[in-house]
Design a protein with these regions (language model features):
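Noncatalytic linker/hinge segments flanking ATPase motor cores
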Residues: 94-99, 125, 141-145
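Left-handed beta-helix
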Residues: 1-101, 108, 113, 129, ...
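C-terminal structural segments of small proteins and small subunits
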Residues: 121-130
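Acidic/histidine-enriched, glycine/proline-rich intrinsically disordered or flexible terminal extensions
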Residues: 131-145
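Residues at the C-termini of beta-strands that transition into short coil/loop
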Residues: 5, 124, 138
């Protein structure tokens, strides 16, 4: 049980509290936080002031676009798998719990050459954190600009 150190009158009634909780719960669960792409999926976990936390799941043989962003940088932490990462014409392979920083304007891509899903936590930082802030140079799914 939770013990509150404030008088009941400061809380209002249980009915009002439950109505507020249910209203917010419905509002939250109406949002579609999981987005499916040809390469796998991503989940928006937390959206703050000028930052967004995502979980990327790149399916086996999945390849994201070779892309850049004008208004944000990204910091990736590999959670599962061994992705091949392109960053400004250099190639890296990362192990679980290793990181890589993608500066604003850098051309980058994630590839999963493996037989198991790659999972990456992505922190986006910037003034515009929308999917429209993207220039695609190469994309095996036909989405290049």
């Amino acid at each position: 049980a939770i013990k509150l150190n404030i008088p009941w009158s400061d809380l209002g009634s249980w009915k009002e509290i439950l109505l507020m909780f249910n209203k917010n719960k419905r509002k939250y669960f109406k949002k579609k936080n999981i987005f499916y792409r040809p390469w796998g999926s991503y989940t928006n976990l937390y959206n703050g002031n000028n930052f967004l936390i995502k979980e990327l799941n790149v399916k086996p043989k999945g390849i994201l676009s070779l892309q850049k962003h004008f208004h944000r940088s990204e910091h990736w932490v590999v959670i599962q798998g061994k992705p091949k990462i392109t960053l400004n014409k250099k190639f890296f392979t990362r192990q679980p719990y290793e990181t890589i920083f993608i500066p604003k304007g850098a051309i980058h891509r994630i590839q999963n050459p493996n037989k198991k899903t790659v999972k990456i936590m992505e922190a986006q930082l910037g003034s515009i954190l929308k999917e429209t802030d993207i220039v695609r140079y190469k994309d095996i799914y036909g989405r290049a600009n």
